[in-house]
């Protein structure tokens, strides 16, 4: 058989010719070592100009396109393109990878930048969103990411003087970014009038917020802050591509070929025009500049690098040049000298010196060059062109000899014949033309058999033959020079070839993988001397093969560097070098060849990673010298760990079936049983596909795993403690080096690893999110801080975790085949080794990734499948055990030697202090010294060695050993057969536990009299187990076939076993020897049962659809039951032994009579009365309820009823064991369910006395023993069973407030939608009518009257410059809770309303504000830890809401957390240490998230509940425990690493208690939790069990609770009618046993408290109605601090004409008068209906209020008594006005009318006129100063003027122009056209008001903005200032009488804002 191994020689990259100047910029720098760093293709190059040497970084796998230099000038970051691109940070000294950043960007990484201290790296992606990311690059951790821009970003730069500030620029934009927490927020640069909006190409930041940027037009734009302040015009005459900042100043380079230097203030120093220099040329374009001291670097578009010394700037040196843009295909080497020539689509031919690494000549052609060839004497050079012509040049002076064009298509291949007389030219037309050199290249022959383009040609040594390859994959031969085809095989065989560059033919068939496309290898070249072949392919690889290379799929060595296609490879004339060309990367690589003799079989590992790569994984064919896989290993690799359905699919399946069957009326479901189960003991150990999964704890207990359970086994007591946290098969287990912690990994779609404590069995951390299918190997690092895991995905990913935090540190792809073991290096925490199928790799962590080296075997051994590995005591020594039985000894990555240890694979190895212990398939344990030089002792595992204290029997001698460990003077061994043995060092062995081997277990039978059971499995064994405290296997027998069922006879002496081949046998139950056997059926026997009493009959059911009945005494078949339409699943006898009940796979329930087997049809009602001997069936009305809602997917495999008929146990395909109360009638009965089995529970049986349940688990091979806990014994210890889900019927009642809050939908609010239903064209889109006479500029006419009456003429006209928020009246209580707190020991309070966080000083009443939120704040919490005093967190509504953490005193934002709680965050809370924050969203899943807020990192997140969660709070003494309550929701959470685990509250059997809607939480000592319920009870929990009720703590829902940290007292607040005894606020003792009630004295019928907080002797209370009240604990006196409007939009607003007062009128049915100076409520009146508008009379004595129901009221201001009222309309009054002369009242309504009333006629209020012809509802009205006219704005965006009081419309523009208005509140009209914004299509400007001075107008809109404009405001989109604070809609706005204040009202935020005018 031909040799398929890789060659022993190697290549090493020596030089790269080229620099990537196209489509990149800023990619050329000086390092600290004065070397030049740049990139080309996929290689980072460090070029030392002094020594003319290069170093290479080869860590990328595709084109590098971006590069950044770390501030230390040594570290380099490079980014690449690709589907999953990554960033490498590497050291320019030793070109080692320091960190890898991956898994975030797609498409490519376009820009990179380090910040000034080098800690953070910013990167920009090439994806559609141009994502910007910030990395903590050393950790490989993403800190923040954000959408960059809609178009390309070209450059990014950090501000060196301000941390966390960054600038990016690109197509038509520049953005200024700030990083806060995990939020990256951008503000766009404002170009203004200073410069044109245009594309910015490069940036540099300077001090004092100055940013310099280079623009596409050649200008430098200078920015201060966000604003463009000046431009330096014509800095370059075309686009500026590069801008470099350094100590000396700035350097710029542009498309005009100039470099300009500027000083630190950007004053010009000098200019260097490279086009004008010696090497310059027209069109030279600079892409990158770098300035260091006296030197400059410039990189050009055409791949040159210039170095300029500043003193001699007219003499730039060209230090590097390569081919320009255009594909590079042509390559030829000089036949006699170390020269190479290349030709490219850039139309140049270049001659390179291989010895000097330099370009010696360049010749430009007219056409693209695609092939070149030297004549044999080296004097002539032929070039094949893209246009089908070829040119021959004289090499000496590069002059043309001939130019011939015979073809149209490109010439891709040409070669001179070895004797120099002919030139063969192959074109894409198909033929090869032959030309005679001596006859001036006359064409003398043509080879034309090819049907496709010619790819390769080779001449024979004697120049008589030619072979060709073409695009169709054909290989043809021709006689030369005629071109006659040659077909004789014999003749062809003997031809010696002068060169071999063809990719087809027997000699090179090994270069092709076994199954492949034909075209992906572009070029090969053979080195006959060393018998090696080099190839270049489409994947950027250069490979070395042996030559000839005959068998497909040969091994090779591969070399990376080229990014995409390697277009050509050639040997130099003396075989010293290989040259390769890259198509797209236009680079030429020069590789030094290291022959075998030099490398002498040992691969030197070059410093470059990714270099010297032996035995590539690409082609793992079983080649000559690798033995075939051992059968055990092969079997293991075939196991499939995928599941049809995973446990996490259950909720969805349930949901789907609910939706399908929603028509079914909801009947009362059966109650769950009272009794429960406890898992006591498991027989089994998973050895058949796992290893190293057996350990001693320090306490001497044994840990291992079986099914989904991890077992802690006590040897002394022969008892087990079980960790039940997993929900599927555990596949791997490892123990912590220091503590008794264990990590276990399981099967799963998103496979989890649990780290748990063996003492407490509590989960410490749960690691998820990075493995698919399963976790097959685990290991802790030596210090125990890290954990490494290997997954079962296709790449066998390796993940390195910080397990305590639950964060992944790094990941990488492991190997394409299974990895068996991973081990951490004991000395170096960042090094690992993995072994697996034909695999050993040594890994080094680098940031978020790993770099790896394969084990290098050299001549000491061959590549083997490795089964185990250990580090030695000495540094760098590694020992691995192979499938051959050898131990391989490694130093670093080199194999030193091998030692024969076992026959067959070495499956297990364990390192000791002074040696090793190994175990193999041969069943022998061997003790070795520390270098595997001597075997000190061997132990063979044999039956004879078993001690008497063994708990079972060995199935066979020398079982295969899968796990081994030492400790406590013993060797612990786990076998493939499922046995765990303990070997004493002196020799005796004790069997501790055992179970079935690989194969499904279905057969299970309990002995009728004794605590014994039998099991039978597909592993072809029958086993008998003792179930008393001994728990051991009594007997075992091997069977010829596997079995699926067994049964004891009624006296227990005989045991019947049904086998899978259709036979069955009856054995003696004691000796397990045959009594009789039959083989009557072909398909498997599925059930077997003896009839009752004497056991006269035996019924045998099979998959042949029959049940056979045998007479036991006569041993004859007496009857056959026919009639089932499918296979039989279960059978049961009745108690008389006459009737058989049968279940079939078609869900039939049938009855047959013994002995003949006659079929009976029995009505269900009758069947229920029959007494059955056993019940194992799953069908029929009495067990209808055991089928789950989604049972079309899952099946119930088994059921069994207790003897007393009360309890039915079932086992199903989800691994659940369930208990039901029998009979189980009606659908979907409730149950208790238990986990432990992994996927399927195949059988369940009660022991003869019903005290124990036995279950077997199918493929998990486990036999589990559960004890039944009766109701009586349960009270003492509550048991967790996963209860079935609770239902709606159980909620604790209904409350209107809770119902409202449940139904609140925040999404409608997020989007700014118009609050009024307007129609028509917006004002700024209407066409303007030109007024009749546009007045001439100078006119004799009288001056135009003022637009607006000036009220305060006496004062100087005052322009309002700014607004500042001064006070807010409002508190959001209606849908929030616990959002009101004391600060500074009760001196201040903090709360929120609208989008403002408010701090109010109680002594002065003054307020300060936090206004960074963009929409309604929904929650607020204060950090209680003294270290974080006054730290507040708030969050809001929004599609991607942010949580802001800020300092309450300075209002400085400390951190911002961008959340993915879509819709909004409705509760937040700090942990005990103040470092963590938990948030819960109003998204559909109600996600709960835990944050480390200072770092801005998300720790963990998980869906909380399907309905609203109201509160989530940390325990006051914990950072890991918290509680959430909500709609029928009560969960106790633990933060385990980065996972959230919860336990539901267990209510148990407490009488009055129901799981109901919970609204609030408080905490007590000793793990007590109090929760307030909707019905007014408080539930008291200990851990997660309910222990008592505080009945009716309040009469209504308990909305809020507060735990005082200093004394533990608890305050509750609820909804309650004030009575003598009760109150809505109560103060309780620590146990909530005694309380004191407080009245709030608000005068309301029902007080509803939403927030309480306790300070020093005071209780702070917030109510649903927006009041904030302080209650004295001693005096019980209450003091109202804030009395805002209640829920409802506020539309009515009017300011007093002369005093600092205003009135607001709201939909809450009240009107309130406020004092502007003292900021307090003066008076309020209840109107009984929603109010919509208000107006003062000009004398300020009366106020008119319009109502939503069409009524209006006039009140006297002083007393708020009604003066008069009237209702002439039935729909809302929108605006109301009293005329300046106090005569008329105008009332505008939704009925498109304005009514006029005469006030002088007294309180009768008769209507004296009205306006009709109004096109839509009225919005605003203004009277003229003389009370003769009124202007009306309408919902159709039309403004009309009417006469008063007749209502006639005024249409003459002339008249309208001359009116002076008393006030202006209209948003319509030419005077205010400028207030309408561009983006108003969905939202409107709602209100406006002009100052009394007439110089400003302020507006409020649907975006929640206040805007201040100049008045009049006649230009569209006028300039303005904007103010935030309101949330969505500003409904009304007014200036106070003296223009000192602006008052604005909010729609949804029910708040009144007062702004000071500055």
UniProtKB/Swiss-Prot annotation:
Localization of this protein:
Cytoplasm, Cytoskeleton
Domain of life of the organism in this record?
Answer: Eukaryota
In what ranges is there compositional bias, type Basic and acidic residues?
1322-1337
Give the residues annotated as coiled coil. Answer: none
* Chief subcellular location: cytoplasm
Q: Where is the composition biased (Acidic residues)?
A: 615-627
WD repeat ranges per the UniProt record: 59-100, 104-145, 148-187, 195-233, 235-273, 280-321, 323-362, 364-403, 406-445, 561-601, 725-766, 770-811, 814-853, 861-900, 901-940, 996-1035, 1038-1077, 1080-1120, 1191-1230, 1236-1276, 1412-1456, 1460-1501, 1504-1543, 1553-1591, 1593-1638, 1685-1724, 1726-1767, 1768-1807, 1880-1919, 1925-1958
**Region of interest called Disordered, as start-end residue ranges on this chain:** 604-627, 1322-1352
Entry-linked PROSITE patterns: WD_REPEATS_1, WD_REPEATS_2, WD_REPEATS_REGION
A Pfam family of this chain: Beta-prop_EML_2
Q: Which UniProt keywords apply?
A: Cytoplasm, Cytoskeleton, Microtubule, Repeat, WD repeat
Which InterPro entries does the protein's record reference?
Answer: Beta-prop_EML-like_2nd, Beta-prop_EML_1st, HELP, Quinoprotein_ADH-like_sf, WD40/YVTN_repeat-like_dom_sf, WD40_repeat_dom_sf, WD40_rpt, WD_repeat_EMAP
This molecule's function is given as: May modify the assembly dynamics of microtubules, such that microtubules are slightly longer, but more dynamic.
Q: What is this protein called?
A: Echinoderm microtubule-associated protein-like 6
UniProt lists the gene as: Eml6
